[in-house]
Amino acid sequence: MTRRFTMTPNSRNPVKTPVSGMKVAPFPRHSIATEEVRRRDMRVVREKGYRQQCVDGILRFLVENGYDGQVSQKILHNPSSKDFQSIFKFLYGFVDDFTFSSRFEDEVVNVMKNLKYPYCGEITKSQLSAITPHTWPVILSMCSWLVDLISHGTSLLQQEEERSVESCFFEYVCDGYMRFMEGDEDDTALEEEFERRVTEIYTGIFKEIDRKKEELRRIEEMISEARKMSEGREELDRKKRELTDDLNMLIASEKQLEGKKRKYLGAISRLSEEIVKVEEEIESLRAQEDGLRAQITKQRINPEDVKEMNAEKIELFKELERMKPEKESLMKVVGEQEREAQERAEEVEKLFFDLKGLRDEISLRIVKDGKGVPRVANEVSGEVFSGMSGVIVRLEEELNSKSDVLVTAEMNKSILEEARGEKESITSELNSRLGYYSDKLVMAGKLYLEKKEISENEQRKSKTEMELLENELLKLNLESNTSLLMSEQKLQKARIVLDRTLNSINYEREEINKMIFGFYNAAMDIHASIQSQVGDLRALLNK
């Protein structure tokens, strides 16, 4: 039965196990508690070198034994009250399974007194309740002393375990010798007791060796099964690696495309705005076109009518050209007749003037006889000139005929002028309509040219954008190929690291096998030496 190494009573709580997984390693107290003797502390606890030594020892012990709290050089140089309580409870767990209550400061002082800490008089409750840089060196020295105590107790237990076989053997020899001196030569029970004690000592070791062998065999079986499974999974692993590489490449490409995506989205937004503006302009032009179309549809004249009117215009022009010679000839005739009539009128006026002058002297006047025939007679003398009356009548008749011809020519002239005016008005109207339709055709041609230019500009822009996108696609292809090469290089490096790891694992397994085999051989050698010594003792006893 394991002995307890403190004066504190046994606790009914279950055995406390530290974080490292080791069981509580109690060790015996080889002294009886007496009254505390206050002694002077010869240590320089506030010296920087001594404090660093204590911190290093505590930190190494906590790390080696699996302390699960936060620990570092900085924390151990200036800890909080919570850090100190956690560290002290962990350290004291290697001594006893005592559970601390809310009166932590009182219990720490009591347990340190029970452990016979030589400088326990310097530890006070106020120092333990509020850890300050001034009081911490004393408490740090106490924790370092507790770590040294635990390490010393552990080494003593190990030494006792190492000496247990030799002590059993010497006890067996002494007991056999004492019984031999007393005359009891029956050492069967003594040998059985010795074998039982030695078996108890090595049973745990042999069980641990068997357990390690079984575990090693199980691990080898698992490795062989894993290898068998890995042979069938190589293809899946290869596909997995390929998919992983593709995924990594896609992720890298996606990261690279994010910036370009934002840039293209901005360009698309700008193009969308421009497209909206162009569409608005197109809508306005369409509205104008619809208005023009509506205006054209409302008109009665269509392009065929324009062609007919143009043909009619040409015919009219031709007719005018044909009428020009007739007009000129008529104008010449009219001019000649007017000139002739003017000359006749001038002659008649001259004659009348002459006659008037003569009439003043002669006093001639035209009279009619009883038959109504006009005759020229002198008023003064009453003389009748029968010859002159015929000439005068003939001249008057000729004058009247010429006057009639002149009136007829004037009428023809007015008719021709009216016809010419009508033709000119029709021609001007046709010219105005022709100009209107020409303007409409020019406007439609300009609109067509503008639309054509807009469409050509859009095609050029689209072509430029397509070329830019093709260039970006080529760049992405090159980048993806580069990423693929880099991924393959990383895969090769990972394979090399995996091979090295497998080699190191195989090497460690071989070393473990060698150590187990050496330990097994050493145990067998010890067992053989013990058997030989037992045989020698039996031979001595038989003598």
Curated annotation (Swiss-Prot):
Protein source organism: Encephalitozoon cuniculi (strain GB-M1) (Microsporidian parasite)
Gene3D superfamilies the record matches: Ncd80 complex, Ncd80 subunit
Coiled coil: 203-356, 450-483
Cellular component per GO, a single term: nucleus
Protein name from the UniProt record: Probable kinetochore protein NDC80
Family of the protein in this entry: Belongs to the NDC80/HEC1 family.
Entry-linked Pfam families: Ndc80_HEC
Keywords: Cell cycle, Cell division, Centromere, Chromosome, Coiled coil, Kinetochore, Mitosis, Nucleus
